Amino acid sequence: MAHKKGASSSRNGRDSTSKRLGVKRFGGQFVHAGEILVRQRGTRFHPGSGVGRGGDDTLFALVSGAVTFGTARGRRVVSVVPAQPAATPAQPAATGS
């Protein structure tokens, strides 16, 4: 009996590479606009305020702020609460002398 099957045959299929899906930024974390929040197949999480959805259902931040997770109408929703701009003291006008 041959222990090799012969030409053009394969022992077994090969495993596919992992796609690194899942939540990338968690609740309470500060994010900048454009950062990826969730990589997913299908809409396990839905975009809330301040969040956009890409063609592959990736959720990303539209504004800078803190990430929040919640539910709306029975759906899991990811939102970004915009950060309050830090109050900067007024700079005195520079004098020439």
Swiss-Prot record:
UniProt KW keywords: Ribonucleoprotein, Ribosomal protein
InterPro entries per UniProt: Ribosomal_bL27 (IPR001684), Ribosomal_bL27_CS (IPR018261)
GO CC terms, sorted: cytosolic large ribosomal subunit
One GO MF term: structural constituent of ribosome
Pfam families reported in the protein's UniProt record: Ribosomal_L27
Alphabetical list of SUPFAM superfamilies matching this protein: Ribosomal L27 protein-like
Keyword hit for Transcription regulation: no
Chain positions covered by the region annotation Disordered: 1-23
Any one GO BP annotation for this protein: translation
Family assignment from sequence similarity: Belongs to the bacterial ribosomal protein bL27 family.
Alphabetized HAMAP family for the sequence: Ribosomal_bL27 (MF_00539)
Protein name in UniProt: Large ribosomal subunit protein bL27
Organism for this UniProt entry: Acidothermus cellulolyticus (strain ATCC 43068 / DSM 8971 / 11B)
Upper classification of the organism: Bacteria, Bacillati, Actinomycetota, Actinomycetes, Acidothermales
Name of encoding gene: rpmA
